[in-house]
């Protein structure tokens, strides 16, 4: 159960002795037939999103990794698996009602903390995040970066989601990191790409703790290298650090 979170955290703090980690635990239902989503459950989740972000603010968190997400299809699939809805039309309406509560709750929670940089995985559907309605990766917020995955050669992986809301890319293929207990394993997914960007943001903050959220985004996206076809915007930590040095000299 804890493999994913441990692996992601290991990537986020790799080779950064100055990084401090705060955990906000999210668990998902892994039963063959998951518990049915309801409006009440969605409202509780929305409240929890806001409370969690407040917890981050109270503890001066600067960067948050989100290697997870929800889609409209997932909600509908859970309703269908539980036989909820007398027909497809009724189930579709209930799906939308529930999903929008999650969506608006998460959007408002992230928006409420402009001083925190949120970095999220684009998703692994090999589809457009807007078409799939993936949250939070479809959000357009000034304190959010959405990350797609490339392989070690810098090419898009076969699974990465894409679209206009995907800001940068990072390695998400066979990334080595820790398991609970200290052993290591290679795992793939945009879940592994996102903490690579968190790792860069944390190292930039280690170099200059006064950087704002907008400064971090400028340095990360400004140092990234866009592919010839425009689909990939691959982070380049060395370039981002050079940009930081240039900014410091000017100031």
What are these regions (language model features)?
Residues 27-137, 153, 182-188, 192-194:
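Substrate-binding/access-modulating region of protease and related hydrolase catalytic domains
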Residues 6-10, 47-54, 58, 104-111, ...:
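Solvent-exposed, polar/charged alpha-helical surfaces in well-ordered, non-transmembrane soluble domains
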Residues 63-67, 208-251:
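C-terminal subdomain of the subtilisin-like protease fold in secreted/lumenal serine endopeptidases
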Residues 15-16, 25-28, 68-70, 170-172, ...:
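Short, small-residue-rich loop/turn micro-motifs
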Residues 115, 121, 129-206, 210, ...:
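Extracellular S/T/G-rich loop segment that most often corresponds to the catalytic His/Ser-adjacent loop
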Residues 1-44, 141-143, 154-155, 161-165, ...:
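Subtilisin-like serine protease catalytic core
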Residues 17, 127, 184, 225-226:
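Residue-level marker of structural boundaries
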Residues 6, 11, 70, 124, ...:
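Gly/Ser/Thr-rich helix-start
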């Amino acid at each position: 159960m804890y493999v994913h979170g441990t692996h992601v955290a290991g990537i986020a703090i790799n080779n950064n002795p100055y990084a401090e980690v705060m955990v906000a635990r999210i668990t998902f239902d892994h039963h063959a037939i998951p518990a049915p989503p309801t409006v009440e459950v969605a409202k509780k989740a929305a409240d929890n999103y806001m409370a969690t972000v407040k917890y981050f603010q109270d503890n001066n968190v600067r960067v948050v990794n989100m290697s997870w997400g929800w889609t409209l299809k997932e909600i509908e699939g859970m309703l269908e698996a539980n036989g909820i809805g007398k027909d497809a039309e009724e189930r579709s309406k209930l799906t939308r009602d529930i999903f929008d509560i999650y969506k608006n709750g998460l959007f408002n929670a992230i928006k409420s903390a402009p001083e925190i940089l949120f970095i999220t995985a684009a998703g692994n559907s090999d589809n457009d995040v807007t078409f799939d309605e993936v949250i939070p990766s479809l959000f357009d917020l000034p304190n959010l970066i959405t990350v797609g995955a490339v392989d070690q050669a810098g090419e898009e992986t076969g699974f990465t989601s894409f679209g206009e809301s995907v800001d940068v890319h990072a390695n998400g293929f066979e990334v080595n990191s820790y398991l609970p207990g200290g052993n290591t394993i290679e795992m793939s997914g945009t879940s592994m790409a996102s903490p690579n960007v968190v790792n860069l943001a944390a190292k930039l903050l280690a170099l200059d703790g006064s950087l704002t959220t907008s400064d971090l985004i400028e340095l990360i996206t400004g140092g990234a290298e866009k592919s010839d076809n425009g689909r990939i915007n691959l982070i380049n930590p060395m370039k981002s650090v050079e940009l930081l040095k240039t900014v410091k000299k000017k100031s």
